[in-house]
Swiss-Prot record:
Keywords: Mitochondrion, Ribonucleoprotein, Ribosomal protein, RNA-binding, rRNA-binding. Gene3D superfamilies: Ribosomal Protein S4 Delta 41, Chain A, domain 1 (1.10.1050.10), RNA-binding S4 domain (3.10.290.10). Residues 202-272 form the S4 RNA-binding domain. This is Small ribosomal subunit protein uS4m. It comes from Prototheca wickerhamii. It comes from the Eukaryota. One of its GO terms (cellular component) is small ribosomal subunit.
Length: 511
């Protein structure tokens, strides 16, 4: 039995039309007939579902697919919010790492499959129709592998280490100056490494270090900053100046530090320039000795103390004598080239009595004197052979040991010097304190006197070898004169020995 829509209620007909519009079905409303009551029940259910939606939304929507899209968008927005809440930063980082690792593994497996397949075909000698040979293919594939993140980090590390090594080797050059040299070396024709080293070795501070005038490059820079170095007779305060062939480098003359020209004239007035070198040295030495004798007359008391503190402490050739002719605080400059002094002091010397027959020694309370030699030859002879106190110039009983049978002068000398330091305190307390400090060190240095003499003899022999080594290790790219304290720069060195490995061509990539 066919039922037309006209027989139904008007409300049900409207619902059916809206359903047809939503389902995009092309059906004539007039031709539709409901054969069973089940269809009516379906319409009622659809009615309830449609009424649940908002009326405004149903009027605006013309297609059921648009409604589905809107629902999906709403679900995505809600799902994103849930994702942010559920995952923390640590889980995100782990998730991203796992993604990267999986992608790398996929690429690695693909590359392995390609390589093994090609190698298997080559081994089986099967023909492969490729645009280019297999070796080129494998070579290009290796290039793509090296362009990964790990290879880039290694290159950066090598560049950084290379820069640090060069900075430390050349006295911690600033990065700006090093970058300038690299740019200049790149612009120059020829090899990059040769240009780089030739430019660095032309720097003023490096040249001073190579010449041997300074111990370090930092000391050379300090000398430049203190305006102690001249380049072509002009003050140069910039240590990074690049020299050219023929430039003359010289130190500041010590005579320039003198304020007046009169002092200079007085120094050079007594020297005859027309005489030969040996005669000049003799004339100068005689006139210097005359000047010293004139200064001795001015400051006799201070000179006595200075000579005593400087030379008498390490000399064991002292002798005590009773000379009642001299007065206190008097100095005489005899023809025998000896300085003698007479100082008032009352002292006694105690030596312990024991089974080894030590005796008690007393000194007369008269004006005694200490005498010592000035010149080095006599001092060395006295140090090499330990002299006992002379018998004629003393009123002291000799002490003998059973083991050595020698006179022990050290204890007597030490106690005489302590009393002498006490007598000086009224005159100058500073020198007395210095002398007391030296005396404390003498006990440890008693046996070192003979060792020092051997060192002096060895040093004289070693100086010969040092001079030979200096001639061998003298740089060939510089003309050095120790007499005038000047250097002539000829050219940059042709060979440089580095204590480490450096690949300077890597630095070219960083530019």
């Amino acid at each position: 039995m066919k039922i037309s829509l006209k027989c139904l209620n008007t409300h049900t007909a409207e619902i059916y039309r809206k359903c047809l519009l939503l389902s995009d079905s092309t059906v004539n409303v007039s031709s539709v007939d409901f054969t069973n009551q089940s269809k009516l029940n379906l319409l009622k259910q659809e009615k309830k579902s449609i009424e649940s939606f908002n009326k405004n939304s149903l009027l605006n929507i013309s297609n059921f697919r648009d409604l589905e899209r809107q629902e999906k968008d709403i679900q995505k927005k809600t799902s994103k919010k849930v994702y942010k809440k559920s995952y923390s930063r640590s889980t995100k980082s782990i998730y991203s790492r796992t993604k990267i690792i999986n992608e790398r593994n996929k690429l690695h497996t693909l590359n392995q499959q390609i390589i093994f397949s090609t190698l298997a075909r080559i081994h089986l000698k099967k023909k492969i129709n490729l645009l280019f040979p297999v070796q080129e293919f494998l070579f290009e594939l290796s290039k793509h592998r090296n362009k990964s993140a790990g290879s880039k980090s290694r290159e950066y590390l090598e560049i950084l280490l290379c820069v640090k090594k060069l900075k430390m080797f050349y006295g911690f050059i600033p990065l700006k100056q090093l970058h300038k040299i690299l740019v200049q070396a790149k612009a120059m024709p020829g090899y990059f490494s040769k240009n780089f080293f030739s430019l660095i070795e032309k720097r003023l501070d490096v040249v001073l270090y190579r010449s041997g005038f300074t111990k370090t490059i930092v000391a050379a820079r300090q000398a430049c900053r203190h305006s102690q170095i001249y380049v072509n007779s002009k003050v140069c305060r910039i240590p990074s100046t690049i020299l050219e062939s023929g430039d003359i480098i010289s130190y500041k003359n010590q005579l320039d530090s003198l304020k007046t020209a009169e002092i200079k004239n007085n120094l050079f007035s007594n020297i005859n320039t027309n005489v030969s070198g040996n005669e000049v040295s003799n004339n100068v030495s005689n006139k210097v000795s005359n000047k010293i004798s004139s200064t001795l007359a001015l400051n006799k008391q201070s000179l006595l103390l200075l000579l005593f503190c400087a030379k008498s402490i390490y000399n064991e050739s002292f002798f005590v004598s009773n000379k009642r002719k001299f007065k206190s605080n008097e100095v005489t400059f005899d023809n025998k080239k000896e300085i003698t002094s007479a100082i008032d002091y009352t002292k006694y010397l105690q030596i312990k009595n024991s089974r080894k027959k030590y005796k008690l020694i007393t000194l007369n309370n008269n004006l005694d004197s200490l005498s010592f030699n000035i010149f080095d030859k006599e001092i060395l002879n006295s140090l090499s052979s330990k002299q006992n106190l002379p018998v004629n110039k003393q009123n002291i009983v000799e002490i003998e040991n059973k083991k050595t049978n020698k006179f022990n002068t050290f204890s007597l000398l030490f106690q005489n010097l302590t009393s002498f330091s006490k007598s000086i305190e009224s005159y100058s307390s500073v020198l007395a304190l210095k002398l007391q400090d030296h005396l404390l060190n003498i006990k440890g240095k008693r046996n070192e006197v003979s060792k020092n003499i051997n060192k002096i003899e060895r040093s004289q022999k070693d100086n010969v070898f040092i001079n030979i080594l200096q001639k061998i290790n003298r740089p060939t790219h510089l003309e050095i004169s120790s007499i005038t304290n000047s250097i002539i720069f000829l050219y940059s060195p042709q060979r440089i020995y580095l204590p480490f490995y450096v690949d300077i061509d890597i630095l070219r990539k960083s530019l």
